């Protein structure tokens, strides 16, 4: 870890202990480049991947990749460094296109599907590129982004509770609102995928497992040796989210799948 990273981490630790959260956030913003706001927005919108506000992709409509792309474009010089450092990762779209050519020659190419597949791969690259720039090159202090991430997932859980209450108390204005907000809605009776299921802000209820075990759980393991406070906060979030999802009958099969015998 270079001296800049150590300095930023020391500042962030000072902000974390004994200061009001809003002052820590303002101090963080004043010590970073303006482009960091795109990174923070991308992190904040990670749990929002199924609304009509996002970019359409097969089976989901995320917002964060576009925000991470804006962050990468604002830091294009650092993006070149990250691309050179992680060249195999950035050659992934080229490799996928080459591997797809035999199938296109034999069965034909569907331009719309090919376009969405390529943009999906680019979304992966800008997300990983944003992380590489922020953590590996700019050495942005990690506590503030992590606080935002935890808060955004708690917010999405709260949205799920509101959806559950709206469904079970038959609050039609709320169910209609969420039905219009979600790209593939599972909320009300007009859903072609079956109504009466909350989905938080995810594309579908089964995505709960992806977020819990693909985003939050790895972060918790990374935090165990770095900051016990944040590891505990992430653990509490995962436990409450998983138990809450099961009790509200959303994504139960996905949450419990690892513990269920094959039928």
Regions found by a protein language model. Give the residues of each.
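Juxtamembrane membrane-water interface segments that cap and precede transmembrane helices
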Residues: 43-51, 184-201
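Structural signal for the C-terminal ends of transmembrane alpha-helices
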Residues: 48, 69-81, 130-142, 219-227, ...
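N-terminal hydrophobic segments of proteins, predominantly signal-anchor/transmembrane helices
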Residues: 35-50, 65-130
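N-terminal membrane topogenic signal
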Residues: 17-39
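Membrane-embedded alpha-helical segments of multi-pass membrane proteins
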Residues: 56-75, 118-129, 208-216, 254-262
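Interfacial loop-to-transmembrane-helix boundary motif in multi-pass membrane proteins
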Residues: 32-35, 88-93, 131-176
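Alpha-helical transmembrane segments of multi-pass inner-membrane proteins
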Residues: 146-173, 192-194, 200-249, 253-262
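Membrane-interface helix-loop-helix junctions at transmembrane boundaries of multi-pass membrane enzymes
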Residues: 27-32, 73-90, 222-236
């Amino acid at each position: 870890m270079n001296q800049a990273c150590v300095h930023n981490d020391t500042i962030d630790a000072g902000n974390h202990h004994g200061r009001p959260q809003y002052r820590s956030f303002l101090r963080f913003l004043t010590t970073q480049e303006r482009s960091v706001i795109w990174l923070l927005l991308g992190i904040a919108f990670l749990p929002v991947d199924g609304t009509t506000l996002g970019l359409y992709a097969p089976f989901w409509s995320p917002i964060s990749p576009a925000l991470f792309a804006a962050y990468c474009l604002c830091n294009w010089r650092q993006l070149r460094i990250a691309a050179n450092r992680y060249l195999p990762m950035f050659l992934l779209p080229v490799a996928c296109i080459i591997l797809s050519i035999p199938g296109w020659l034999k069965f034909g190419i569907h331009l719309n599907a090919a376009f969405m597949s390529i943009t999906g791969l680019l979304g992966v690259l800008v997300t990983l590129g944003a992380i590489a720039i922020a953590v590996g090159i700019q050495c942005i202090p990690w506590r503030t982004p992590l606080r935002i991430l935890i808060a955004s997932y708690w917010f999405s859980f709260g949205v799920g509770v509101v959806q559950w209450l709206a469904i079970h108390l038959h609050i039609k204005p709320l169910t209609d609102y969420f039905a219009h907000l979600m790209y593939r809605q599972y909320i009300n009776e007009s859903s072609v995928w079956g109504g009466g299921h909350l989905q938080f802000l995810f594309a579908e209820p089964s995505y709960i497992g992806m977020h819990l075990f693909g985003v939050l759980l790895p972060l918790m393991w990374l935090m165990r040796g770095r900051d016990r406070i944040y590891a505990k906060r992430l653990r509490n979030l995962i436990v409450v989210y998983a138990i809450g999802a099961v009790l509200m009958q959303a994504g139960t099969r996905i949450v419990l799948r690892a513990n269920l015998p094959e039928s």
